[in-house]
Amino acid sequence: MDWTWRFLFVVAAATGVQSQVQLVQSGAEVKKPGSSVKVSCKASGGTFSSYAISWVRQAPGQGLEWMGGIIPIFGTANYAQKFQGRVTITADKSTSTAYMELSSLRSEDTAVYYCAR
């Protein structure tokens, strides 16, 4: 595989233990620079609409970085300034699923991406 033109985009599952909410994310993706990726986060075992869903990422050797979040009942997302214009976070209340789409991918976007409640 030509790693000059591709990089790994990984997502990982997170579990909300206190509220017994489980968040299950879509799998790992390999994308080319300049493309976009959309990952999902399906909630089960609790109320989806009333609580914020955040997206964070962790690049190799780095700490956690908050990208943005959404409260599904309101439908309006907030984004970290760093990602403004490149990230779109949405939620589908009917399927209890949140989505994060990141566009104009760069090599420095290689990271593990988490959804969290």
UniProtKB/Swiss-Prot annotation:
Residues 53-69 are annotated as: Framework-2. Residues 20-44 are annotated as: Framework-1. GO terms for biological process: immune response; immunoglobulin mediated immune response. SUPFAM superfamilies: Immunoglobulin. Residues 116-117 are annotated as: Complementarity-determining-3. It is found in: Secreted; Cell membrane. Residues 1-19 form the signal peptide. Residues 70-77 are annotated as: Complementarity-determining-2. It holds the Pfam family V-set. Residues 20-117 form the Ig-like domain. The modification Pyrrolidone carboxylic acid is found at Q20. Residues 45-52 are annotated as: Complementarity-determining-1. The keyword Cell membrane applies. Residues 78-115 are annotated as: Framework-3. One of its GO terms (molecular function) is antigen binding. Disulfide bonds join C41-C115. Keywords: Adaptive immunity, Cell membrane, Disulfide bond, Immunity, Immunoglobulin, Immunoglobulin domain, Membrane, Pyrrolidone carboxylic acid, Secreted, Signal. GO terms for cellular component: extracellular region; immunoglobulin complex; plasma membrane. InterPro entries: Ig-like_dom, Ig-like_dom_sf, Ig-like_fold, Ig_V-set, IgHV. Immunoglobulins are composed of two identical heavy chains and two identical light chains; disulfide-linked. V region of the variable domain of immunoglobulin heavy chains that participates in the antigen recognition. Immunoglobulins, also known as antibodies, are membrane-bound or secreted glycoproteins produced by B lymphocytes. In the recognition phase of humoral immunity, the membrane-bound immunoglobulins serve as receptors which, upon binding of a specific antigen, trigger the clonal expansion and differentiation of B lymphocytes into immunoglobulins-secreting plasma cells. This is Immunoglobulin heavy variable 1-69. It comes from Homo sapiens (Human). The lineage of its organism: Eukaryota, Metazoa, Chordata, Craniata, Vertebrata.
